[in-house]
């Protein structure tokens, strides 16, 4: 039934024993001339004259009609070229299906370890997975998803060319900018400040990215309780999953050397909402704290001491934001279920990070170390200076490090002293050359339209010296452990998916946290990532092929689809024969 396909030089894929495919594409990326409809033409198999051989195909190739045809438009586009390259890459790695030559195998390549080591560790040099990677294994077709994972660079380039993907990113960014305008203001200030002072910010990209994520998360979560409007967006979180048994890790040891079998799962929460526990109204400035002359440390101490009261009246809802090309929620249940699970992971992570501040402190340090970062290395002084100038709460807080005072975090205070030094003495030179006054962004009050204020470098001269306690990632991990402990204790069991069409939030789904469902999903996803099972293609029904395969990049070269569609055709013929025979009796 599955005889070897013959492909003519123009891409027609011909199965001599069965039928001719039109509007198809070969595995090497050759595109086939489109017809108005994708017909299948039966070739009578009981008539030898009806079977096309190599000579017949050669005659077809030389018909004048084919000499005047031009390649399809898709092959001339950047998207078409990337797609051809991706298909060739996946074919080379997975190989052809030995039972169905010319089509890609639907089993993991032999000789490779498992997707986690093949893709994350060896290919991307990342010793971690993401929540998205766990949730997208089963949200659509697991086969397609892992073809994409193994060709991640090309797949991402193709995704970035798609209009809807770009539109979705813009919506997420506009929501973040609306809630946290200080981020763009900080970037603009830093660009101008470095240019005017002729300073450079020589900092490792991975360190810079992590530092920004940690700094922004602390600042946004603190603002959630102070001057914020009851919302925080783009908050990092993480947890661990066991490499051996695929279970989410609930309790961590404090040393990374004892947790090597646990893989980090990282995520970014789209939206947190602080609301009244009883009437569900959004809470603005729930802690009723005046932030003037305050510091991160003072605010965190206040929140921790009043946590019981905060918890009795308030809760925090975790939301995931999904953008749509039409104002309708997905019709496929597995897609909605995947979004629900994604939000459940975030809930679990915050619960994990709110059990014990010392454990959470070490958890963040392990996260940084797994990224190859030195948690004891002093952070770039210029980076810290920009934080000091633009964030008074941070500036007031790090005075403790400047003077060698404790920050009221036992794990950090016992761990902070080291041989490294943190020296900002060089910034004294700025006072003798160039401008010393700058407009910096400020957090706006509702009754104020001012978005900047003028500061002088001379006002911060006390920082331009050698600090008694070096400023390292450990300081940020300590403050993160405190604010995550507070937020985690307030996280609601109600979770939410927000659907956006353009900038309109047209529908929300609220659902309960289900730890049993989450545990089952985590284990099943871990098994495929860590090599405990093979990929699960979609159930081979015609409805599924029509639904899942319609826009799939691999639809023309997928052996699973091809083989099972042939079986469905044969089954249809058998049923037709049975019906005819029954009607003749």
From Swiss-Prot:
Record's Gene Ontology CC terms? mitochondrion; nucleus
The reported effect of residue 320 to A is:
Impairs exonuclease activity
Question: For [4Fe-4S] cluster, which residues are the binding ones?
Answer: 141, 549, 552, 558
What does the UniProt cofactor note say? Binds 1 [4Fe-4S] cluster.
- Which key words tag this protein in UniProt? 4Fe-4S, DNA-binding, Exonuclease, Hydrolase, Iron, Iron-sulfur, Magnesium, Metal-binding, Mitochondrion, Nuclease, Transit peptide
Enzyme Commission (EC) number = 3.1.-.-
* Cellular location(s): Mitochondrion
Q: Where is the transit peptide?
A: 1-26
Q: Which GO terms describe its biological process?
A: interstrand cross-link repair; mitochondrial genome maintenance
Pfam name, any one? Exo5
* Needed cofactors: Mg(2+); [4Fe-4S] cluster
Top EC class for this record = hydrolase
> What InterPro entries does this protein's entry cite?
Exo5, EXOV
Description of pH dependence: Optimum pH is 7.8.
Q: What else is known?
A: Present with 1420 molecules/cell in log phase SD medium.
| Protein function | Single strand DNA specific 5' exonuclease involved in mitochondrial DNA replication and recombination. Releases dinucleotides as main products of catalysis. Has the capacity to slide across 5'double-stranded DNA or 5'RNA sequences and resumes cutting two nucleotides downstream of the double-stranded-to-single-stranded junction or RNA-to-DNA junction, respectively.
- What's the protein called, per UniProt? Exonuclease V, mitochondrial
Source organism of the structure: Saccharomyces cerevisiae (strain ATCC 204508 / S288c) (Baker's yeast)
């Amino acid at each position: 039934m599955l005889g070897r396909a013959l492909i003519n030089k123009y891409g027609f894929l011909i199965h001599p024993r069965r039928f001719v495919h039109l509007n198809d594409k070969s595995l090497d990326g050759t595109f086939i001339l489109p017809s108005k409809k994708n017909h299948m033409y039966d070739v009578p198999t009981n008539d030898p004259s009806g079977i096309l051989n190599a000579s017949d195909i050669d005659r077809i190739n030389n018909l004048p009609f084919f000499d005047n045809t031009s390649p399809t438009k898709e092959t001339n586009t950047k998207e078409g070229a990337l797609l051809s390259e991706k298909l060739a890459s996946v074919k080379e790695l997975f190989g052809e299906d030995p039972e169905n030559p010319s089509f890609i195998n639907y089993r993991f390549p032999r000789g490779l370890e498992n997707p986690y080591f093949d893709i994350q560790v060896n290919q991307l040099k990342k010793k971690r997975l993401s929540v998205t990677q766990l949730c997208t294994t089963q949200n659509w077709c697991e086969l397609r998803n892992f073809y994409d994972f193994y060709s991640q660079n090309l797949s991402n380039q193709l995704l970035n060319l798609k209009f809807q993907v770009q539109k979705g990113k813009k919506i997420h960014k506009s929501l973040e900018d609306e809630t946290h305008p200080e981020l763009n203001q900080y970037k603009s200030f830093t660009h101008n400040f470095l240019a005017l002072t002729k300073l450079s910010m020589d900092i490792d990209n991975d360190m810079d990215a992590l530092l920004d994520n940690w700094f922004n998360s602390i600042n946004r979560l603190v603002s959630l309780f102070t001057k914020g409007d009851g919302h925080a967006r783009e908050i990092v979180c993480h947890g661990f999953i066991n490499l051996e048994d695929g279970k989410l890790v609930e309790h961590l040891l404090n040393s990374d050397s004892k947790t090597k079998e646990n893989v980090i799962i990282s995520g970014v929460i789209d939206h947190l909402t602080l609301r009244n526990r009883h009437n569900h109204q959004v809470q603005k400035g729930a802690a009723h704290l005046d932030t003037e002359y305050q510091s991160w440390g003072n605010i965190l101490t206040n929140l921790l001491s009043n946590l019981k009261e905060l918890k009795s009246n308030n809760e925090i809802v975790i939301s995931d934001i999904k953008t749509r090309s039409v104002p309708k929620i997905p019709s496929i249940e597995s897609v909605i279920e995947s979004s629900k699970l994604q939000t459940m992971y975030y809930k679990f992570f915050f619960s994990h990070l709110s059990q014990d501040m010392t454990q959470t402190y070490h958890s963040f340090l392990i996260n940084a170390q797994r990224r190859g970062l030195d948690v004891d290395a002093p952070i770039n002084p210029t980076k810290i200076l920009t934080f000091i100038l633009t964030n008074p709460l941070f500036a007031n807080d790090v005075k403790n490090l400047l003077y060698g005072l404790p920050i009221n975090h036992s794990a950090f205070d016992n761990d902070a002293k080291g041989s490294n030094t943190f020296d900002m003495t060089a910034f004294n030179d700025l006072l003798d050359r160039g401008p010393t006054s700058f407009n910096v962004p400020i957090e706006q009050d509702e009754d104020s339209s001012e978005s900047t204020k003028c500061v002088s470098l001379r006002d911060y001269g006390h920082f331009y010296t050698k600090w008694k306690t070096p400023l390292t990632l450990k300081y940020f991990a300590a403050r993160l452990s405190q604010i995550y402990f507070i937020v985690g204790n307030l996280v609601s069991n109600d979770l939410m998916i927000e659907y956006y069409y353009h900038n309109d939030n047209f529908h929300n789904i609220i659902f309960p946290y289900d730890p049993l469902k989450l545990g089952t999903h985590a284990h099943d996803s871990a098994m495929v990532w860590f090599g405990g099972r093979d990929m699960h293609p979609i159930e081979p029904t015609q409805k599924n092929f029509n639904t899942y395969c319609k826009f799939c990049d691999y639809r023309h070269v997928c052996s699973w689809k091809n083989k099972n569609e042939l079986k469905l055709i044969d089954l249809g013929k058998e049923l037709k024969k049975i019906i005819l025979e029954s009607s003749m009796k």
